[in-house]
Amino acid sequence: MPLPPLASAGASLDRTQVERYARHVLLPQVGMSGQERLTKAKVLVVGAGGLGSPALLYLAAAGIGTIGVVDADVVETSNLQRQVIHRDADVGRLKTDSAADAVDRVNPHVTVVRYDARLDSANALDILRDYDVVLDGTDNFPTRYLVNDACVLLGKPHVWGSIYRFDGQVSVWWAEHGPCYRCVFPDPPPPGAVPSCAEGGVLGVLCAAVGSVQVAETIKLLLGIGEPLVGRLLVHDALAMTWDALTVRKDPACPVCGEHPSVTALIDYDQFCGVPAARGGASGREPEEPGEAEESQVPVVGAVSLAADLATDAPPLVVDVRGPDERSIAAIPGAVPIHLDAFRDGTAFSDYEELASRDRRIVVHCKVGGRSAEAVRLAVAAGYTDIASLGGGVLAWVREVDPTQPQY
């Protein structure tokens, strides 16, 4: 059933506002009073990336009075395929600055509050406290759990979305009326178990599909209309073009919103998720690939050094652990393709003639160094001694050795 509106009654709309929002005002569920609530509402968007982009545009168009944006990242060229608020001219700028400009282009009457810092346990409660609804567009597990716990402690709902490849999920987590994120996902996946969009890819337009649903849910919560996705998990398969709603329930044993909560203050979420401390980002940038931050734990060779070694009479064997789609974008000439999965199941050491000799020097590479570091660790455990990971992966090779190839 509908819940009480979260946005307070606002001041009367002037003539220009009525003209701008007339199609909202014509809706009986919104009307003049509802639009007045929206112009007074405050919504925080965590992450100005794939999901945050359409969300920010439609929140602005809807006339949300104040929109907060949390993101510590800068715009990169690879963002432009799906993060539609950013343009070519914005590459290198703070995402919060680019986002604020995009919101202003859509609706100059909206106030934008920028937080160009990583959302963490030290600042989350202070930032979230002033907003009616939190829209979670983050791309990493530590921040998802952080946003959830902060919202539970503050008694606020948060509208959550997630995308990967062709699949999306949306729900409204609100402990006062249903489950929180931890009720349904009590434990984070092991580090590296879930590939990032940077590793596995994502259909750009999927961001619009999921982000738009998040905005619709946000508006419903602000106005107290319709049936919000509290207690339901909406699952979208863009390839099959299906939307399924799954019932999810509150967990009485939930450590943060259950009958006897053990989490009564924010914790170290990087540690909770078993990942190294994040380095910037929407709320802490998601590593480009699993294990990226652990590259320093294995022997590493630089791209320029590798290029020099390849020009000698005794060049090392270069192994590429990426998949064929990634190799089609950028590659090191002569690299032997042996997928990381073959290192994980041991077949790399038994089924590939190239690795039959354990005396030849081997350099393993991937995109930026995370997957290759894992492969090197597995090879060392299997008895290989003269093996190293290419620091920075093929992207370092492109930057430092062969800039004719594209970055991705």
Regions of interest found by a model, annotated:
Residues 1-44, 78, 266-288:
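N-terminal charged helix/coil linker that caps or initiates catalytic domains
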Residues 2-5, 107-121, 125-213, 223, ...:
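E1/E1-like adenylate-forming module used to activate ubiquitin-like modifiers
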Residues 3-6, 80, 101, 240-252, ...:
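Rhodanese-like catalytic fold shared by cysteine-dependent sulfurtransferases
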Residues 4-12, 66-107:
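Glycine-rich phosphate-binding loop and adjoining beta1-alpha1-beta2 segment
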Residues 46-47, 70, 365:
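Conserved N-terminal Rossmann-fold NAD(P)-binding element of oxidoreductases
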Residues 51-52, 371:
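Hydrophobic/small residue at the entry helix of a nucleotide-binding pocket
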Residues 61-66, 383-385:
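Conserved S-adenosyl-L-methionine
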